[in-house]
Amino acid sequence: MKLSELIAHRNQLLEYNIADVAYHARHKLSDVVHTVKNSVIQPRTYTQTMEEDLDNVVDVFDQFGGTLNGLIQELDFMIEVAEKTYYQDSAVRYNEESSRYGKLDDKTNTDVDQQILDRQLEMSPETQKMLSDRINSYIDWKYAGLVIRPGKEHFINDLVGLDPLYLIDWGNALLTPAVSKFNTEYQDRLRLYIEPPTSTDVLSAIPNNQLGLCLAFNFFEYTPIDILENYLENIFKKLRPGGTLAMTFNDCDRAHCVALVEKTYGFYTPGNRVKATAKRIGYQQQFTWNDNQNLTWLELRKPGALDSLKGGQTLAKILPKTLAKSK
């Protein structure tokens, strides 16, 4: 049985609230007993028998709920065993892909970059507007911003109010579509950095305690759990107190997201582990949302209050337009 099937079955069972069913059933049956008990018509011992039956019904509901919980626990154990292979396969696949990045012939390298840029999360216009509104709620020129893999996403336009604005990706070709959205003057203000996929000291070029907002949209869908957790650790260091990480990832607590992993369209990153890791690091969960497809949006906040010593908006350091800094 596939892991996606195990998780789908577990999630379906979790939707059943046996305690709620038992509560309503007991109250309905109690109404029946009350009607019988308060009637002047009392043939034989039906009232006593019905009261005893009601107690038995409650016990049976408790037993049924316990059996269901036992089944869910057994499924959790089966998932824990099965997911070890998914973690390993995701890591191996990522390591193979990242070790080859930029090291093949020019045409193949260009094709790989284009494939990465063409990856899109499908969104309804309503979802796109909702996410834009949430991003815009964090925009303030007093604070710096970072976008990891800006790609072709329209969200880059929402972040121009952050000063300075850092853009990071694996190579210049991946940054070009985002940079080209702006005029020459603003392009020169962007802080561009190259960070190879094999880098272990991620985001080392970004100053600590500087970012008011970090956006990673449609990036962690293509990283295994250890890479994602490494980014969480380092982004936390880069955020100012009160700063926010807004991110999407392939939430494998959802069965259809696990199915993407089984088709090698994504990597295995369960939401329960991602959120537990974030909590351990020190993040506070601000907001989470998912649609009926593959998008899971998560906002994590570094504790503290945002403050700034800036007295007026200043220009970022001028950088060459065509070449990004390389670590």
Regions found by a protein language model. Give the residues of each.
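A generic structured-segment signal
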Residues: 201-205, 211, 236
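Local beta-strand N-terminus motif with an aromatic residue
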Residues: 142, 210-212
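A short glycine-rich, Lys/Arg-flanked "PGG" loop and its adjoining helix->strand segment in the class I
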Residues: 229-241
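Class I (Rossmann-like) S-adenosyl-L-methionine-dependent methyltransferase catalytic domain
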Residues: 2-205, 223-229, 244-327
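A conserved beta-strand element that flanks and buttresses the S-adenosyl-L-methionine
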Residues: 215
